[in-house]
Each structure stands twice: as structure tokens, then as C-alpha cells.
């Protein structure tokens, strides 16, 4: 099996875990029954995966929690709990399973309401008040609705961009239960077609790009599956976070230590005027498995440390090495002239596992 085929199979497996199978036709809302099936979100994501030119750093597919299409008033509810760090939204679009242009009202603009609602806690009392947070209302004229790959597509970049730029704004929207909740007899929610999705294309902030580091580690730490792993540890399970607790003595972990350099000892003292000595620092110590964000790993180092945890005799540990350095200004003699020059990468500022 080729590496490309293996990656596709892994993506399919991840999708199956994250998105339950679509409901049967009898359970779908009336406006989706009996219609030709649209390409699944997985098929669309695979087409993006095969695209040789990535459109953004991160592409998310959010399945609708609830959809209500009544005439020209359309309401969509998604779980935006992933909004934990700032991102620059490049493009956002709703991809819906609608039969065709005849379902788009032509007498006026569509009113679109976007809500946030976290996925329900299975231990919650069904009679409890449900919380749904309004995020944005905007209008779309019929000419802005397009049809691509068997789906109805609505571009919604501008209304949602502020939420990714300031994820804390979502928390500020949480008001009193009286304002944001409604009490009603409990009825099971109507399943929503799994092909109704919100596609979000976003880039990491420029400062985060410049810092580099293991983007896979950030995703793993913020994912809902990582959060579930933490819960399993709290309940006595054996999860990823519990394994991380078995670390070497912190005093033996990768760190920066003093490293005094004397130019006279290496025979350079005759032409270097200043400094004659300086503290270059160096890195020493063990790297934990798996390695944490505080050790500034690359994606490759993070994956290597995970494999080392499960195959300790086959995979070598990552190495403690400089990840950030700074220059040293030196005054020295060159062909009878006195020069002042700044030489980069002379002093270790931070150590990490690579």
C-alpha cells in the first residue's frame, strides 16, 4: 500500500470516529428527504487533501447541530467550542444538502442566523434548560448562493471572521439563563443531515508562524479527544495524560546550563580584544516521552517522542538542543584594523527537544 493511500485511509478512519454515520432517510428533515445524495463531507475533505496547493493552514468541517430552514429565515447551530486560540479566517462557507435552485427563495434576501451550542452532556438531565448562544445574523441575496459539487454553498466569511480573531468574544456572549434559555417539554432532537457543514479556512497568526513549533501538539492538546482523555484519567482510566505523569526528575530534564567560553584557551585571545570570556550556555538533560509544548518540539520531534513512548526499544529519544539563540558582539583585530561585528547564534537562550 502506498503512503498516499495509507494517509487517505487514516483520514477516513478519523472522520468515522469524529462523525457518526448519517441518519437514515426516515429520520431526515422533510426538506432533505428523497433527494439525490450530495457528496459527503469526507469526499470533499479528501478532494482538499489531494489539492497540491493548500488553501489555508487549517481547514475545519463543522457538522450542524441543528438546522431550521423556514422560507427566507434560515437558522444554523454549530459547536464552536474549538475557539480557543486566535486564528485569521481566510474563508468560510456553508455547504448544505438542498435539491437545487428551486429551493432558494427569489423574492428577497435570506436571513441567516448562526448559533453556538456545545454538544450535550450525556449525564445532563433532559429536562434542564438548553443553552444556545446567538453569534451573528446576516442577509444573503439569492445571487450570492452558488452550487458546487452537488451542494448549496453560502459564503459567510465576513460575519464569522471576528469570532476567530477574538475567541474570547464568544464567552462574553453568555448571558443569564433567562435570556438565553427556553424551557419546554423534552423531546429528542431531530437528526440533521450530516452533509450540512460549515467549512472554515484559517491561518495561524503571523507571530505563531514565526515561532514555529509542533502544530500537531497544539491540535492534540486542544482537541475534544484530548479533553476526553483527561476525563478518563480523573475517573481512574489509563489515558494519554496519565502516562505523561511518569516523567524523569524535573532537575534531569532538558534545560539550559552555564557554559563558560575562554578565548585564550582555544588560542583566539591574541586577536579578540573583547570579550575575552563569555557565557555561551549549553543544553543538557533528558527529553520526556511524549514531549510537552514547553520543550518547543517540531512536529517531527513530537511524533518521534510519541512513538518512543510506545516502542522504547525501537525509537531513539529526541535530543536536547538549542531552539533559540542570540548574537554576540565582538571587538577584534583583522588585518591591522579594529572591527566590531555581531555574530549570530553565539549564546543559547532556550533549549528544547528536537
Curated annotation (Swiss-Prot):
Residues 27-244 form a propeptide. Disulfide bonds join 254-320, 283-351, 287-353. GO terms for biological process: anatomical structure formation involved in morphogenesis; anterior/posterior axis specification; anterior/posterior pattern specification; apoptotic signaling pathway; axial mesodermal cell fate specification; brain development; cell differentiation; cell fate commitment. Keywords: Cleavage on pair of basic residues, Cytokine, Developmental protein, Disulfide bond, Glycoprotein, Growth factor, Secreted, Signal. InterPro entries: Cystine-knot_cytokine (IPR029034), TGF-b_C (IPR001839), TGF-beta-rel (IPR015615), TGFb_CS (IPR017948). Glycans are attached at residue 73. Residues 1-26 form the signal peptide. Its main location: secreted. One of its GO terms (cellular component) is extracellular region. The keyword Secreted applies. SUPFAM superfamilies: Cystine-knot cytokines. Pfam families: TGF_beta. GO terms for molecular function: cytokine activity; growth factor activity; receptor ligand activity; type I activin receptor binding. It is found in: Secreted. PROSITE patterns: TGF_BETA_1, TGF_BETA_2. PANTHER family: NODAL HOMOLOG (PTHR11848:SF159), TGF-BETA FAMILY (PTHR11848). Belongs to the TGF-beta family. Homodimer; disulfide-linked. Essential for mesoderm formation and axial patterning during embryonic development. This is Nodal. It comes from Mus musculus.
Amino acid at each position: 500500500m502506498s503512503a498516499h493511500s495509507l494517509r487517505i485511509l487514516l483520514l477516513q478512519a478519523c472522520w468515522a470516529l469524529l462523525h457518526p454515520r448519517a441518519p437514515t432517510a426516515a429520520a431526515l428533515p422533510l426538506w432533505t428527504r428523497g433527494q439525490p445524495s450530495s457528496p459527503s463531507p469526507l469526499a470533499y475533505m479528501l478532494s482538499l487533501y489531494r489539492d497540491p496547493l493548500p488553501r489555508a493552514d487549517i481547514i475545519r468541517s463543522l457538522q450542524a447541530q441543528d438546522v431550521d430552514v423556514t422560507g427566507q429565515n434560515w437558522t444554523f447551530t454549530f459547536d464552536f467550542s474549538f475557539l480557543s486560540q486566535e486564528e485569521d479566517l481566510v474563508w468560510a462557507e456553508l455547504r448544505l444538502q438542498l435539491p437545487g435552485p428551486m429551493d432558494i427563495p427569489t423574492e428577497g434576501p435570506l436571513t441567516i442566523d448562526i448559533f453556538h451550542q456545545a454538544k450535550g452532556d450525556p449525564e445532563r438531565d433532559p429536562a434542564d434548560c438548553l443553552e444556545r448562544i446567538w453569534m451573528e445574523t446576516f442577509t444573503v441575496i439569492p445571487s450570492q448562493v452558488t452550487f458546487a459539487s452537488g451542494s448549496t454553498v453560502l459564503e459567510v466569511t465576513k460575519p464569522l471572521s471576528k469570532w476567530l480573531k477574538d475567541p474570547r468574544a464568544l464567552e462574553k456572549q453568555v448571558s443569564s439563563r433567562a435570556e438565553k434559555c427556553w424551557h419546554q417539554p423534552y423531546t429528542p432532537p431531530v437528526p440533521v443531515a450530516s452533509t450540512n457543514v460549515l467549512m472554515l479556512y484559517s491561518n495561524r497568526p503571523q507571530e505563531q508562524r514565526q515561532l514555529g513549533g509542533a502544530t500537531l501538539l497544539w491540535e492534540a492538546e486542544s482537541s475534544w479527544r484530548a479533553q476526553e482523555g483527561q476525563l478518563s484519567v480523573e475517573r481512574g482510566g489509563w489515558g494519554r495524560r496519565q502516562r505523561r505523569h511518569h516523567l524523569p526528575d524535573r532537575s534531569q530534564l532538558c534545560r539550559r546550563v552555564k557554559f563558560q567560553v575562554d578565548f585564550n584557551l582555544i588560542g583566539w585571545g591574541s586577536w579578540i580584544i573583547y570579550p575575552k570570556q563569555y557565557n555561551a550556555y549549553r543544553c543538557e538533560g533528558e527529553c520526556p516521552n511524549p514531549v510537552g509544548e514547553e520543550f518547543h518540539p517540531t512536529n517531527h520531534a513530537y511524533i518521534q517522542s510519541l512513538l518512543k513512548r510506545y516502542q522504547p526499544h525501537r525509537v531513539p529519544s529526541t535530543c536536547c538542543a538549542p531552539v533559540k539563540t542570540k548574537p554576540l558582539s565582538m571587538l577584534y583585530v583583522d588585518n591591522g584594523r579594529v572591527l566590531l561585528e555581531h555574530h549570530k547564534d553565539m549564546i543559547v537562550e532556550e533549549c528544547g527537544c528536537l
